[in-house]
Amino acid sequence: MNNKAILRTLLRCAALLLVTVGAVAEPAVAAEAPAEEQTPFQIISEVSKLDLTPYAGKAVFLNFFTEWCPYCMEEMADIKKVFETYSPDDLQIILVHVWDGEDEKNTASIRKDHKLEELTFFEDEDMELARLVGLQGYPASLFFDKEGDLAFGANYALSYDDMAKQMDSMDVAKSELAK
């Protein structure tokens, strides 16, 4: 058999397989709303293990990090300062620990070393959320406004001033202690 005949046979087998699988596959569960009507916030909640729905009505700051990333660790002090400056009634910060060769022991040491016990951590054990958002490197930050729309994203380290600028642009109230 020549190469063209082999290729044609393989393509026919692949097409037959696709048709067969499509015929026996279970119907997909419909999303609550069409994707074009959903906010990025809702899509993340629906298709990943991170449920953002408890934070509806708040601005949400997701920071993706690993312990081996020096820029990520440098950001922690500024993230803590944002946490202390802005009202928890208006802002939810979630530190997304991407398990890129790490595990929960790394999270425990980061919490302790950077005094972040009060912050919310999400363990991205299988890097599912990192893949979903198209993470290209560390650190990375996503800022969602109070309506659940993506207000800003960065794939580089941010300073406190950069973070505060985003909070102010999303009209996040300052905490009583910071006023």
Region locations from a protein language model:
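Non-globular targeting/processing and membrane-anchoring segments
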Residues: 175-179
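Structural microenvironment flanking redox-active thiols in thiol-disulfide oxidoreductases
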Residues: 73-114, 125-131
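Short active-site neighborhood of thiol/selenol oxidoreductases, capturing the structured segment around
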Residues: 52-73
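Active-site acidic short loop of glycosyltransferases
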Residues: 56-58, 88, 116, 135
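Bacterial N-terminal signal peptides that target proteins for export
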Residues: 2-14
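N-terminal "domain-start" segment that seeds a small globular fold
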Residues: 26-52
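Thiol/disulfide oxidoreductase modules built on the thioredoxin-like
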Residues: 113-117, 125-168
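Bacterial N-terminal signal peptides
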Residues: 12-22
